[in-house]
Amino acid sequence: MEIDDACQTIIARRQPAAGDLRFVLAVSRVIVDLERIGDEVKKIALKAHELLGNNRVAARELYNTHRMGTVTLGMIHPALDALARLDTAAVIELSETDKHLDADYRAQLRSLITFMMEDPRSISATIDIMFMNKSIERIGDHAEKVAEYVVSVTRST
């Protein structure tokens, strides 16, 4: 909230124009995406704690989820860095990474559905893993969105 308040103060007092205004508005939008990333991370942590703490699933069964999470985690800092540096080349790279993450998510979803059909006892835990994977995929989408704000800041009107 403090950053959003600071953005509003800058707009009210300084009345930025053109590129400066686009940057302040982008920062304001980034805050929303970072908050949503935090919400998704919280969901993942709660599900992982529940799954592992209650021995509903072995840690090795979360390997692909961990791998997807590592890719997503590797997207957040570069997305923020791209915005700070106004690096449009990084936006393209992050967009490609997100496409791969989306494909990986779909492949993992198919694999988990097959696993549930083969072992109906695993349905509850597997559905939780699916929700975790979806949260990870959403985090990747938010990271890509943060990077895409670079395009809106750098484009001329």
Q: For each of these PLM feature ranges, what is it?
A:
Residues 1-157:
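Cytosolic, long alpha-helical scaffolding segments
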